[in-house]
A protein has these predicted regions:
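Alpha-helical scaffolds flanking conserved acidic
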Residues: 1-4
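Hydrophobic helix-and-loop "lid/oligomerization" segment in the mid-to-C-terminal part
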Residues: 7-174
Length: 174
């Protein structure tokens, strides 16, 4: 499980890898079931997973290089993160925010100057919580309102991300 988790979080050791990740992979190599890891890494999608991707694709909005996408209600956390990684495949996108209504927010960044963990922490300050690493982070905003209030909250969250990213970009130009 540890080996698979490290490989998933680092996109098969190609993103955000640290020395500890490599040491753990090396130590666990002979202890883990390589066939099981292959099966897990190459597993097929469930229909529900495909629907989450479909919802995200149909809802995506891109502002400069920032994408926002909605996977629908109660999407599993791992799938939200996977969709967020998928959104980074777009040429126009280098910072991705993907959320599941009433669930989680996943953030990914390909730009060294845009630290996903710091940005989500600042964007959600006072309304929720978030944090993580420079290239990937997650967060949550507790909410029990109706659909109209939820739409307003999502718009507020988008504006917060855009504001924090704009301020971060301006600081990096100094």
């Amino acid at each position: 499980a540890l080996t698979f988790g490290i490989r998933m979080d680092t996109q098969k050791l190609s993103r955000g890898v640290c020395k500890m990740d490599m040491e753990m992979i090396w130590r666990m190599f002979d202890l883990c079931d390589q066939d099981m890891i292959y099966l897990l890494e190459n597993s097929t999608l469930y229909f529900e997973d495909l629907m989450a991707y479909s919802k995200a694709i149909s809802s995506i909005e891109v502002f400069e290089n920032i994408s926002f996408a909605d996977t629908g209600r109660d999407c599993p956390e791992a799938l939200i993160a996977s969709v967020s990684d998928f959104m980074l495949a777009l040429v126009e996108v280098s910072f991705s925010v993907v959320y599941s209504r009433k669930k989680e927010i996943s953030v990914r960044s390909e730009r060294p100057t845009l630290d996903a963990g710091k940005i989500i922490s600042k964007a959600l300050k006072g309304i929720g919580s978030g944090g993580g690493h420079a290239t990937m982070a997650g967060g949550f905003v507790p909410f029990d309102g109706n659909d109209r209030e939820e739409d307003l909250m999502i718009q507020n969250i988008r504006e917060r991300f855009i504001d924090v990213i704009s301020r971060t970009k301006r600081k990096s130009l100094r």
